[in-house]
Amino acid sequence: MNQDLALRVMSDIMQWDDDESRKEFRWLKLMARLKYDGYRDFQAGMRFTESLATWLQQFDQEERKDAYRFVKERMVYVGPGEVRRLVEQFFPNTIRQRIVQTVASNLGIKPYTVLTNPDAAAAIKRLSRQTLVLGLSDGARMDIVRHANVGRLSNEQLVLAPQIDTEKWKDLLKNLREDLEDPDALFKIIYLVDDFAGTGTSFLRYKEKDKKWSGKLNRFRTSLFNAISDPEVGNIVAPDWQLCAHHYMATANAKDKMIASENTARKDMKH
């Protein structure tokens, strides 16, 4: 369906008069061109006006104005360019800040002094290599993370796999120790990365029927401890290691849900 036809269909569905049609057509064309038609994920190539018209037809006539107003005034859409910017800022604004804060705390100095302190600079370089980033889905955009951080993070530190097998853990540990020239080196920071958390349940949830924990965090935990229990692998993470979950976007409800689930899971899981 071309845009002119889609707009006429929208006008019929919403029962707009000529003045309303002219006003709303300007907004629909603008938003389609600047934002919505750039969508490339689950159904790339879908057109905004056509999709909106189809969606609105599920409502009774008296409900359509409210549904349309919701899309126009309340819906938040993050386009490809904005997502890319969020991904590119992940290392400098999140990982780097945690590394600096950790080193400063360990050395008992102020974070703003680390770059002038030779010991701190060396510790930052080492801790940066002891950081591992695991993408939980394609939405983690690990390719963009890799390209945006050449010289900061090596390919061996970026893994797209929600559940790593024992052989992969062995390879990651081997590469870490070779790079640091330290046969006893262990990972100290691990990031679990995904694009969006809407409810928080896919990350961690308790299955009442099965009486067990499930979700991406639990799969990571199982993967890690399976590898640690292998005599050929042993310890992978340092005693004071940090596990961080990072979503490029999340609802407030998902954040609260994940925190609550984590607190409950800590009481249930003994490791």
Q: What spans do the regions from the language model cover?
A:
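PRPP-associated nucleotide enzymes
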Residues: 1-271
